[in-house]
A protein has these predicted regions:
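Short internal beta-strands
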Residues: 31-44
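Short, solvent-exposed amphipathic alpha-helical segments in soluble enzyme
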Residues: 21-27, 49-53, 104-106
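Short, glycine-/small-residue-rich phosphate/pyrophosphate-handling segment
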Residues: 123-155
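Short, acidic/small-residue loops that bind anionic groups at enzyme active sites
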Residues: 106-128
Length: 155
């Protein structure tokens, strides 16, 4: 099985929704490398499951970065640009303007630019995690030619 690097981010109003999604999918997520912004990562690391009467914390291996507004979104964006993130699950609150909306915009732009699997809602996240390509050893993400073309442009 291919081990993916998955970034998990949620705005305050959607953190519990992401925690529920992670709880539901803990059996899959526990086999991958997880990264999250500060508080979101703390909540995910505290997810408790009971197997054979024993409490377990299957996602406590998550790597916590800074909180989104203090640089966590940019840390994840840098990881995307460096090819270190395969999937971004970002449950964003689109009903309010975030104080760090420029960081959020930059993060979503990089996810699109570098062609990573990217979900902003539970339905899309469900589609990604249940796709046969999700942990297919033979599948390779294609980096758009436009990136190489831009890097090699004549000035």
């Amino acid at each position: 099985m291919k081990k993916l690097n998955i970034a998990l981010v949620a705005h305050d109003a959607r953190k519990q929704e992401l925690v529920k999604w992670c709880t539901f999918n803990h059996g899959v997520l526990k086999n991958h490398n997880l990264f999250a912004t500060g508080t979101t990562g703390k909540l995910i690391s505290e997810i408790e499951t009971v197997e054979d009467g024993i409490s377990q914390y299957p996602l406590n291996h998550i790597k916590r970065l800074k909180s989104g507004p203090t640089g966590g979104d940019q840390q994840i964006g840098a990881m995307i640009a460096e090819g270190k993130i395969d999937v971004l699950i970002f449950f964003c609150d689109n009903l309010i303007t975030q104080g760090h909306h420029q960081d959020v915009g930059a993060l979503t732009r990089l996810a699109s630019l570098y062609n990573i699997a990217f979900a902003t809602n539970r339905t899309t996240a469900d589609m990604i995690i249940t796709s046969p390509l999700f942990d297919d050893e033979t599948y390779e993400r294609v980096i758009p030619y436009s990136i190489k073309s831009y890097e090699n442009r004549k000035l």
